[in-house]
Amino acid sequence: MNARNSGAAKKRIGIVGVGNIGASILRGLLAAAEPGAAEEGARIFLSDVDKERLGFFSSSRVVVCESNAEVAEKSEVVILAVKPNDVRKVVEEISPFLSGGQKVLISVAAGVPTSAVENWFAEAGVGVGVEAGVGVGVEAEAGVEAEAGVEAGVEGREGARVKVVRVMPNVGARVREAVSAVCRGKYATEEDEELAKWIFSAVGTVHSVKESELDVVTGLSGSGIAFFAEVLDAVAAGGVHEGLPYELSLAIAAETAVGAARLVLAGEKPSAIKEMTASPGGTTVRGLYALESRAVKAAMMMAVIAATRRAREIAEQKSRQIKNQNSK
């Protein structure tokens, strides 16, 4: 992580929700911290509905907050790692502290488009009076007349400038080997996207995509990690069938998969790897023939296609739910 050049390491980061993904991001950020970072003061702020869970994250760089609003108030970047159905509620809680377009919200909620999050902030009043420098919510508490916010309301609701970045990591984040896809909303800048990429590089690799491509990434990576696990289990079972203990067979299968992946990442094409190992009449070509005769390649393709189509269905369902909520 090139934190020295980006300046991202100096950002105060808030994480709302420390379940599997939120906790993985936190651990990755702490592990990637530069030497001496702890001495500079706490830069990570946490909240979660499960207060007991928060007790597991004690560190000189971490502050456990009493509320989601406190996290948003103290942070420059807020990572929303809550369930999709909870996003709107959290947006309403933190909206007074994201006005003015200075802070960045990063959402990892599956199936919730950036446009929906932006609209929810607009409905909550973020951006109201931005042109006139009035922040409804915070300023109103300080005694600014509510009518001022109402007068600016129409333009403010249309012109809310909350910078939203959407990220979809996979469960590899638990061991800092996630593959994450990043896209930005209407008001987020390229710099905001780079900031999100820096944060998520703490738990693996990151790729920029269009938001319309996220469903495919879900099928390929979000679900795909389970497909590879299925393959590993099957290969290990083959080793067991031929006499190896399962744990040894599984370890060898996983290590072999890592080697194949690293060859590909180093520039080798999958077809070239097969050519390296498949000699005429040998063991590899016999095994490849067995795979081809049972249409394993087609089955793997169909798994990605089926998962992608289901991701699209879920996204469409979520969009309909959002429209129904907005119409009430």
Set out the residue ranges of the language-model regions:
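NAD(P)+-binding Rossmann beta1-loop-alpha1 motif at the extreme N-terminus of oxidoreductases
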Residues: 1-73, 240-242
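NAD(P)-dependent Rossmann-like dehydrogenase/reductase catalytic/cofactor-binding core
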Residues: 2-3, 251-328
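Intrinsically disordered, low-complexity terminal tails and inter-domain linkers enriched
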Residues: 3-9, 31-40, 122-161, 321-327
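Rossmann-like NAD(P)(H) cofactor-binding subdomain of soluble oxidoreductases
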Residues: 26, 68-80, 84-139, 149-182
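Small-residue helix-packing motif on alpha-helices
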Residues: 44, 54, 71, 87, ...
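Internal alpha-helical scaffold of NAD(P)-dependent oxidoreductase catalytic cores
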Residues: 116-126, 157-163, 179-216, 229-266, ...
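Short pre-catalytic strand/loop immediately N-terminal to key active-site residues, enriched for Gly-Thr
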Residues: 165, 214-219, 270-275
